[in-house]
Amino acid sequence: MRALTSLSVVLLALISTVSAQFGFFEQMFGGQQQGQQQRPQNVPSDSAAYRQQYDRSYCEHYLCPDTLACVHYPHHCPCPWPMNEDKFELSEGQRICVSKGGFAANEAARKVELARKGLL
């Protein structure tokens, strides 16, 4: 009886070791185990998803192409990243968004003004 118990313990240990090894190899070579979540997929490299969102957007006035904000005039469009960009309205009724300046205050505004004058 004692030999049978020892044999069953050894068999159980062997089976659990073999099972653990197969689980390791399955995980190493990309196998999916039950209960694991799949990683999210990258967005497609074409603009179809954006165009669908743009086509579904409703606006009575002007729909900003980069933020999909509905405004009265194109130069009222907000910048997509207001924490990182400064907005400048141009005399032609348009606006541009420029990355905020680095070290000096109002550096982006100074560079836009230099560009308007043709000095940059």
UniProtKB/Swiss-Prot annotation:
Q: Which protein family is named in the record?
A: Belongs to the LCL2 family.
Task: Give the range the annotation lists for the signal sequence.
Answer: 1-20
Taxonomy, superkingdom: Eukaryota
Protein's recorded name: Long chronological lifespan protein 2
Q: What does this protein do?
A: Probable component of the endoplasmic reticulum-associated degradation (ERAD) pathway.
Q: Which keywords has UniProt assigned to this entry?
A: Signal
Q: Does the keyword Signal apply?
A: yes
Q: Tell me which Gene Ontology terms the entry assigns under biological process.
A: ERAD pathway
